[in-house]
Regions:
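Residues at beta-strand starts and edge strands
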Residues: 60-62, 93
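N-terminal presequence-like segments and adjacent domain-start helices
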Residues: 1-44, 50-58, 89, 102-110, ...
Length: 124
C-alpha cells in the first residue's frame, strides 16, 4: 500500500521572511511614518518630536507606537488620540495606536481606529 501525505498550511513550519521581505517591510513602515507625520498638525508634530514613535506592520494591523518620556507628555498624547486615529483611519482601517507611558509608570493604552466613533462622542 502506497501512503501519500498531504500537509495543510498549518502543518508547515513558521514562515521565515527573506531579507527582501524584511527590507520591503522596513521601507513600508518608513513611508507610512513619513506620510503620517507630514499630515499631522503642528501641535501633534511638536508632541511627537519629544517622544520615541514608529509605525510597525508586524501584526495583522498597522500600529503606531508612541513611547512617552514623562507623564505630562503621555497625557497630552492621549488627548490627541482622536485626531491621530482619524488620520490613521485614512491610511488603514485596521490600524491602531499604542501609547506607552514611561517605564514603571503605568500600562500602555491601545486604541483601534475602528473604535473612533466611541471616542469622538466622548470628546464632544
Amino acid at each position: 500500500m502506497n501512503n501519500k501525505y498531504f500537509f495543510q498550511n498549518d502543518d508547515l513550519g513558521p514562515f521565515q521572511p527573506s531579507s527582501a521581505d524584511i527590507m520591503l517591510r522596513q521601507q513600508l513602515e518608513t513611508s507610512l511614518s513619513k506620510f503620517f507625520y507630514e499630515n499631522c498638525d503642528r501641535k501633534i508634530r511638536d508632541l511627537l518630536s519629544v517622544c520615541r514613535w514608529y509605525v510597525t506592520t508586524h501584526t495583522s494591523a498597522m500600529t503606531l507606537v508612541i513611547e512617552c518620556p514623562d507623564q505630562v507628555t503621555n497625557w497630552r498624547i492621549l488627548q490627541k488620540m482622536v485626531p491621530m486615529a482619524s488620520l490613521l483611519n485614512n491610511i488603514a482601517s485596521s490600524a491602531k495606536i499604542r501609547v506607552c507611558p514611561p517605564s514603571s509608570q503605568g500600562m500602555p493604552f491601545e486604541m483601534r481606529v475602528d473604535e473612533l466613533s466611541v471616542y469622538r462622542e466622548d470628546s464632544a
